[in-house]
Amino acid sequence: MKEYLTNERIRAKQVRVVGPDGKQLGIMDTREALRLAQEMDLDLVLVGPNADPPVARIMDYSKWRYEQQMAEKEARKKAKRTEVKSIKFRVKIDEHDYQTKLGHIKRFLQEGHKVKVTIMFRGREVAHPELGERILNRVTEDLKDLAVVEMKPEMLGRDMNMLLAPVKVSA
């Protein structure tokens, strides 16, 4: 968090003073502004050091700083951490198993996670990548309302991978 110059540490000769209510009090000597702040039992805080003259505000600095820290903490808490979930299919997947895994993918997408869909090939199945593409295309078609394909199907060793991301909901 940024530190501000306060009270006696302000070195400018004159400052533009903003009162605790946000109203402009005008340009005055720093000593005069400091005396005014002390009369109100508040701090003089240099908030605009690069302005001409610098801008100082009369406020309760420790209270303001605490509120800023709490707001920062709350923002970090609300920042969504997206995870990449992984679902694996086999080439010869049964319809019920497919629907179950599709349900898992839907739930992950609704929670805002990305989903890596993997088709695992065994033995000679690797000679028929079109079977894996068919399953991935079906998944894409079944989830077209919930997801967008972030990474198209691609072979990696004995696996074919595709990455789905949740559709952004426009509010």
From Swiss-Prot:
**Name used for this protein in its record:** Translation initiation factor IF-3
Subunit architecture: Monomer. Binds to proteins S7, S11 and S18 of the small ribosomal subunit.
This chain's source organism reads Thermus thermophilus (strain ATCC 27634 / DSM 579 / HB8)
| Location relative to the cell | Cytoplasm
Looking up InterPro entries in the UniProt record yields: T_IF-3_C_sf (IPR036788), T_IF-3_N_sf (IPR036787), Translation_initiation_fac_3 (IPR001288), Translation_initiation_fac_3_C (IPR019815), Translation_initiation_fac_3_N (IPR019814)
GO CC terms, sorted = cytosol; membrane
What gene name is given for the protein in this entry?
A: infC
- Which is a GO BP term held by this UniProt record? ribosome disassembly
**Family statement drawn from the similarity comment of this UniProt entry:** Belongs to the IF-3 family.
Question: Which UniProt key words apply to this protein?
Answer: Cytoplasm, Initiation factor, Protein biosynthesis
Keyword Protein biosynthesis assigned to the entry: answer is: yes
GO molecular function (one): translation initiation factor activity
NCBIfam families on file:
infC
Per the record, the major location class is cytoplasm
**Physiological role:** IF-3 binds to the 30S ribosomal subunit and shifts the equilibrium between 70S ribosomes and their 50S and 30S subunits in favor of the free subunits, thus enhancing the availability of 30S subunits on which protein synthesis initiation begins.
